[in-house]
Curated annotation (Swiss-Prot):
Residues that, per the record, bind adenosine 3',5'-bisphosphate: K83, T84, A85, S86, T87, S88, R164, S172, Y279, S285, T290, K293
Keywords, sorted A to Z: Coiled coil, Disulfide bond, Glycoprotein, Golgi apparatus, Membrane, Signal-anchor, Transferase, Transmembrane, Transmembrane helix
Transmembrane domains' residue ranges: 12-28
Protein's organism: Mus musculus
Protein location: Golgi apparatus membrane
Family designation: Belongs to the sulfotransferase 3 family.
Protein name: Heparan sulfate 2-O-sulfotransferase 1
Chain ranges on the Cytoplasmic side, renumbered to this chain: 1-11
Primary subcellular site in the record, as a coarse category: Golgi
Lumenal side: 29-356
Length: 356
């Protein structure tokens, strides 16, 4: 190549470089089109499968009036917040679904929009509450909390979630958009080619690392009200806290994911039997790590922490962490550095009237 460069006139060298650059751009464009075509095909196949099931459901006669066993009539919704180890946790559910006999379904919204239209909310609620073929069901997707009670549903689904330190979550998302992860390393990401570090972005006041980008975990728990997505809304944070306490079965934290899995296995063995052992001793195929991630400097962190938005998101995170640790403290005991689930700690007595 070096010899050709010497022999080739400067103009031809320039043309060769330009031709190579054009060829690379064309190749990247074709790869992007192939990825988009693959995604469209996957969606079409998924819709076809759903239609087939619905057709069988119609031919066999409606089953929504059929009585399901209480253990089977369960729906879990994991409305996962991006970059909180959600894929790692979801893959555990996929690994266990055949063994534990339940279904896992991904809720794929257009452009990952976490807010559904009113008509889609109605469809979604009706779909998963009457789709008995998919029960017990574990649904997961990047959607904000949806209150099933306001749609007149008799039996609400079980909500679970995981949240993360807000700055760590934003840093992970920033690099994910540029470099992807080790789960699908060949997939082209939206910001691929941008080599700017998170520190440089914050120093320059870039939009991808602005404090407003921290506002995500609160609206995901707050829900579908317009005020939930009003950045910095105190009402939204209060509503998110209320939902976390009153509407969520369990909310864990990324930093203590194993303990979250252990508590789920103890409380909901129908879905999570074997999950703790899989997490501890499995091949870790479910784990996912963002590529090329660089930890921010203390100066960068300090600058973000001056924002009122960070203060609110961090307050919500600390609130969730305190609640999770409270639940864990009453469910496990520690021995030799390891945690063990407590046995049943209540019983019934003085039962009247006495049976003959």
């Amino acid at each position: 190549m070096g010899l050709l460069r010497i022999m080739m006139p400067p103009k031809l060298q320039l043309l060769a470089v330009v031709a190579f650059a054009v060829a690379m751009l064309f190749l990247e464009n074709q790869i992007q089109k192939l990825e988009e075509s693959r995604a469209k095909l996957e969606r079409a196949i998924a819709r076809h499968e759903v239609r087939e099931i619905e057709q069988r459901h119609t031919m066999d006669g409606p089953r929504q009036d059929a009585t399901l066993d209480e253990e089977e009539d369960i729906i879990i919704i994991y409305n996962r917040v991006p970059k909180t180890a959600s894929t790692s946790f979801t893959n555990i559910a996929y690994d266990l679904c055949a063994k534990n006999r339940y279904h896992v379904l991904h809720i794929n919204t257009t452009k990952n929009n976490p807010v559904m239209s009113l008509q889609d909310q109605v469809r979604f609620v009706k779909n998963i509450t009457t789709w008995n073929e998919m029960k017990p069901g574990f649904y997961h997707g990047h959607i904000s909390y949806l209150d099933f009670a306001k749609f007149g549903v008799k039996k609400k689904p079980i909500y679970i979630n995981v949240i993360r330190d807000p700055i760590e979550r934003l840093v992970s998302y920033y690099y994910f958009l540029r470099f992807g992860d080790d789960y699908r390393p060949g997939l082209r990401r939206r910001k691929q080619g941008d080599k700017k570090t998170f520190d440089e972005c914050v120093a320059e006041g870039g939009s991808d690392c602005a404090p407003e980008k921290l506002w995500l975990q609160i609206p995901f728990f707050c829900g579908h009200s317009s005020e939930c997505w009003n950045v910095g809304s105190r009402w939204a944070m209060d509503q998110a806290k209320s939902n976390l306490i009153n509407e969520y079965f369990l909310v864990g934290v990324t930093e203590e994911l194993e303990d979250f899995i252990m508590l789920l296995e103890a409380a909901l063995p129908r879905f999570f039997r074997g999950a703790t052992d899989l997490y501890r001793t499995g091949k870790k195929s479910h784990l996912r790590k963002t590529t090329e991630k660089k930890l921010p400097t203390k100066q960068t962190i300090a600058k973000l922490q001056q924002s009122d938005i960070w203060k609110m998101e961090n307050e919500f995170y600390e609130f969730a962490l305190e609640q999770f640790q409270f639940i864990r403290a009453h469910a496990v005991r520690e021995k030799d550095g390891d945690l063990y689930i407590l046995a049943q700690n209540f019983f019934y007595e003085k039962i009247y009237p006495k049976s003959n």
